[in-house]
A protein has these predicted regions:
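Secondary-structure edge/capping motif, primarily at the C-terminal ends of alpha-helices
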Residues: 25, 29-32, 49, 56, ...
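Extended amphipathic alpha-helical interaction segments
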Residues: 64-151
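Extracytoplasmic/periplasmic, Sec-exported soluble proteins
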Residues: 10-20, 30-37, 63, 88-101, ...
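Short, charged, amphipathic alpha-helical segments
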Residues: 39-44, 97, 124-131, 154-159, ...
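A cross-kingdom marker for long, charged
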Residues: 146, 150-187
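Long, charged/polar, soluble alpha-helical segments
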Residues: 2-7, 53-63, 67-70, 74, ...
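Charge-rich, solvent-exposed alpha-helical interaction surfaces
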Residues: 4, 17, 21, 41-45, ...
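N-terminal Sec/ER secretory leader and immediately downstream segment
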Residues: 1-69
Length: 187
């Protein structure tokens, strides 16, 4: 819900929310739904965090009539671009918070039967990458937690996602727990 963004006060919460809205934006874009409302929130959060380039990168269009594989490659390249730019701007902690929260949001989307149908471009790409994504984040968090204490909480919060998103079926079975993980990130 976009209204919740106004309640966020700390940079950590804002970075996590930005990651969640970025995930929503990509999924809305992939299924051809309007993105204006989410774009507005992304713009505000990105401005607050001084990373306004995020929206410009997100708005780049995927190739028309892209196959599932091409769309996945495009989204991965886009994420890499955001990561590189944030690293260049020395915002590694915010970037990891964003990626962690985006993973939790993607897990919610995979787990929600009303949002994603199996075989849909988004769910197909998401479920195969989710475990890998959470494992990678765990490694990064372990490396950085000494410098950024908030990351330790992020890592501990999202770690259980790994077994819950092994398949679309397991994600759906764990829907309520996955939603709880996502909600815990914004507390």
């Amino acid at each position: 819900p976009v209204g919740k963004a106004a309640e966020l006060s700390t940079p950590t919460q804002k970075a996590r929310a930005l990651g969640m809205y970025m995930a929503d934006y990509n999924v809305l874009k992939a299924i051809g739904k309007p993105t204006d409302e989410v774009e507005g929130v992304i713009a505000k959060l990105a401005t607050d965090l001084n990373v306004s380039f995020v929206l410009d990168i997100l708005k780049e269009q995927a190739p028309k009539d892209a196959t599932k594989e091409q769309l996945q490659a495009f989204l991965n390249a886009q994420e890499d671009k955001i990561i590189e730019k944030m690293a260049a701007e020395n915002k590694i902690d915010a970037e990891v918070e964003m990626l962690g929260a985006a993973s939790a949001e993607y897990a919610c989307l995979v787990a929600n039967p009303t949002l994603v149908v199996e075989g849909d471009a988004t769910s197909a790409g998401l479920s195969t990458n989710m475990e890998k994504r959470v494992s990678m984040l765990e490694e990064v968090v372990a490396d950085l937690a000494a410098y950024y204490p908030d990351l330790k909480q992020l890592g501990e919060t999202i770690a259980p996602l790994k077994e819950k998103v092994a398949s679309i079926q397991s994600a759906r079975a764990a829907n309520a727990e996955i939603m709880g993980i996502r909600d815990a990130l914004l507390k």
